[in-house]
Amino acid sequence: NRFTRRELTEQEVYVFTVVLCDNDIDRDYERFTPGALEQLAQLYVGKTGIFDHDPKSSGQTARIYAAWVDTAPGETTQVGEAYQRLMARAYLPRTKENQALIEQLDAGIKKEVSVGCAVGSVTCSVCGTPRKEGCAHQKGYRPSGGPALLRPLARRAGKK
């Protein structure tokens, strides 16, 4: 009830857990550092969930009320690090309009999310050069005998 305008009962809200992002390499050959995940955990509390990256208030559906970094036992990333993910607890009101969404969440149909944030810097994981300055390493290049992915870019959460 920290983010509501009035006290809501358990029967009035649907609560669920979602994985927001992790420290593994994504489709853009980037990844969050464990430190960035910790920063994002603090930043996402109180933020709303929207559909299709549409920032209109009419698209706001759920609100995050808790976030934390979870280490998955026995799982590793493509670069061999312990797999960590940013988890969140969110709620949405149990309304007639939200009933179909609640059913899709329960059935596991709606479960993937995409997060948005501003980052302070993006650096090459091989040489540490800031992305804006450029370096000789090609994003996603796999050298023979080298690591699974040479150049995932490390993201660091920063101010907008």
Regions found by a protein language model. Give the residues of each.
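Signature of dsDNA virion morphogenesis modules
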Residues: N1-K160
